[in-house]
């Protein structure tokens, strides 16, 4: 919670206030209202322990808020500007003649809503929203890096496996070639054996017809 | 002014080539373009009527723009008539006729738009009264300054001094806000730099993995080639083995017959 307390006042007359936590902000705020110098428009900040009181005075109307030191100035003063515009838009010229706490019942709810908005909603400040978005982008990119590294590991495994597959297919090709050679040689031997057998049979037949192993009648 | 210069330059160059035929078409096209521009300006002025910017000067400008567009419409209408008369002659290029017809339709469209804008302007001119700035105020200020007294002068100096103090405070405040905003922007800039570094790292990783994928592709291609060759070797081996079976069968048959003959001969 960045903004803890807010009030709207005319001079030192408090018209509306809201406190988000139980602190002594109200007392200190009233002291600050008396201490703010001059009657002209101004923007000032007062430090008190860990909190800072930001005061904005415009056209006789003073808007004050108490914020944590870490909230900086941009968001609290944007809050003050917003509250001032809403207050003037809602009550107009009645601001200059109203009694103390005259608008407190209605406007304290608006103060509460805006305190919550400027304290918690990233959209209240464009720079903070962009910071948040850049953080998201960075997270997504780091996640992407992790995924790509994981993918790299799997690709390495795949490289190893495909290298093994390549080796196996080379071996398969070599063995297939050897097998073909063996089968061819067996075929060759069978052919030669068949030819020899046929020659032997022919010789025996011719020898029988020629009446002798040395073929005397035919030669 | 620059457009008119461009137009005159273009007209001069075109006249050398075409002998003046295309000159009228080009003139009509540029006229329609100028009318379009004028009508846009006129509409923008009409949209300003009824707003705090509505002043007698604006009304005067509106009037001048209306007259200017009227003159442009008159000139372009004459040129369009001249171009259409040229189209009726024999031997005119059909594409020129088509272009002139298109220009005529464009001219009609822009005229309708101008008439609509004129009606809107007339309505708003009667509805609204121009905003006259208060010229009486400066004279009263001037009268006030004439009666300056030393006491008022001293008060004026004191007021100026306070004003300077307030301005200094305002400057300090604005500088603090600007400093804070700059710090936030610096952080955003730093984060963007980090994201840039992450993107570069990612690019390096993706490139390396591209090399790995190329290796995988090479391995798979080699495996496919080797498998194809092995398959062809096996197919040939299968054919040879089939031939072996036939030869073995033939040998057995012949051997059987020989044995049979020998047995018959011995038995006899």
UniProtKB/Swiss-Prot annotation, chain A:
The modification N-acetylalanine is found at residue 2. The keyword Acetylation applies. Expressed in flowers, leaves, stems and roots. GO terms for cellular component: plant-type vacuole; plasma membrane; vacuolar membrane. The keyword DNA-binding does not apply. It is found in: Vacuole membrane; Prevacuolar compartment membrane. It comes from the Eukaryota. It is a single-pass type IV membrane protein. One of its GO terms (biological process) is protein transport. Residues 126-186 form the v-SNARE coiled-coil homology domain. Keywords: Acetylation, Coiled coil, Membrane, Protein transport, Transmembrane, Transmembrane helix, Transport, Vacuole. Residues 211-219 are vesicular. The chain crosses the membrane at residues 190-210. Residues 7-111 form the Longin domain. Residues 2-189 are cytoplasmic. CDD domains: Longin (cd14824), R-SNARE (cd15843). Involved in the targeting and/or fusion of transport vesicles to their target membrane. The longin domain is essential for the vacuolar and subcellular targeting. PANTHER family: SNARE PROTEINS, VESICLE-ASSOCIATED MEMBRANE PROTEIN 711-RELATED. Belongs to the synaptobrevin family. This is Vesicle-associated membrane protein 711. It comes from Arabidopsis thaliana (Mouse-ear cress). The lineage of its organism: Eukaryota, Viridiplantae, Streptophyta, Embryophyta, Tracheophyta. The gene is VAMP711.
UniProtKB/Swiss-Prot annotation, chain B:
Disruption phenotype: The sgr3-1 mutant has a reduced gravitropic response in inflorescence stem but a normal gravitropic response in hypocotyls. Reduced formation of vacuolar membrane 'bulbs'. This is Syntaxin-22. The gene is SYP22. GO terms for biological process: amyloplast organization; intracellular protein transport; late endosome to vacuole transport; negative gravitropism; stomatal movement. Expressed in roots, leaves, stems, flower and green siliques. It is a single-pass type IV membrane protein. Residues 2-246 are cytoplasmic. The chain crosses the membrane at residues 247-267. It comes from Arabidopsis thaliana.
């Amino acid at each position: 919670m960045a903004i803890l307390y807010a009030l709207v006042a005319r001079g030192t007359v408090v018209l509306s206030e809201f406190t988000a936590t139980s602190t002594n902000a109200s007392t200190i705020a009233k002291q600050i209202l008396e201490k703010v110098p001059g009657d002209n428009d101004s923007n000032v900040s007062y430090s008190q322990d860990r909190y800072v009181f930001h005061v904005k005075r415009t056209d006789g109307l003073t808007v004050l808020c108490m914020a944590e030191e870490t909230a900086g100035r941009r968001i609290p003063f944007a809050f003050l500007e917003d509250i001032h515009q809403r207050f003037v838009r809602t009550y107009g010229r009645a601001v200059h003649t109203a009694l103390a706490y005259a608008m407190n019942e209605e406007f304290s709810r608006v103060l509460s809503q805006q305190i919550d908005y400027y304290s918690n909603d990233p959209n209240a400040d464009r720079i903070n929203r962009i910071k948040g978005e850049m953080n998201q982008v960075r997270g997504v990119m780091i996640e992407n890096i992790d995924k790509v590294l994981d993918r790299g590991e799997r690709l390495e495994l795949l490289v190893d496996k495909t290298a093994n597959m390549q080796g196996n297919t080379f071996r398969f090709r070599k063995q297939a070639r050897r097998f073909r050679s063996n089968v061819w040689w067996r075929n060759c031997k069978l052919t030669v054996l068949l030819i020899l057998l046929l020659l032997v049979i022919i010789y025996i037949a011719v020898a029988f017809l020629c009446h002798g192993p040395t073929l005397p009648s035919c030669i | 002014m620059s457009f008119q210069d461009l137009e005159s330059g273009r007209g001069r160059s075109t006249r050398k080539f075409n002998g003046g035929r295309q000159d009228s078409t080009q003139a009509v096209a540029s006229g329609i373009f100028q009318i379009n521009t004028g009508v846009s300006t006129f509409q923008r002025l009409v949209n300003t009527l009824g707003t705090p910017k509505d002043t007698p000067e604006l009304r005067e400008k509106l009037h001048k723009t209306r007259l200017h567009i009227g003159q442009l419409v008159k000139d372009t209408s004459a040129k369009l008539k001249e171009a259409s008369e040229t189209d009726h002659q024999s031997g005119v290029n059909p594409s020129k006729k088509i272009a002139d017809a298109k220009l005529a339709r464009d001219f009609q469209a822009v005229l309708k738009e101008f008439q609509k804008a004129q009606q809107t302007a007339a309505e708003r001119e009667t509805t609204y009264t121009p905003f006259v700035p208060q010229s009486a105020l400066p004279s009263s200020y001037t009268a006030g300054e004439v009666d300056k007294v030393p006491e008022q002068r001293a008060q004026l100096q004191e007021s100026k001094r306070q004003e300077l103090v307030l301005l200094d405070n305002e400057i300090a405040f604005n500088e603090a806000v600007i400093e804070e905003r700059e710090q936030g922007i610096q952080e955003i800039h730093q984060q963007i730099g980090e994201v840039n570094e992450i993107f570069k790292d990612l690019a390096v990783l993706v490139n390396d993995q591209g090399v790995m994928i190329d290796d995988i592709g090479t391995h798979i291609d080699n495996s496919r080639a080797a498998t194809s060759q092995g398959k062809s070797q096996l197919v040939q081996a299968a054919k040879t083995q089939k031939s072996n079976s036939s030869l073995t069968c033939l040998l057995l048959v012949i051997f059987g017959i020989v044995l049979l003959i020998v047995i018959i001969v011995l038995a006899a």
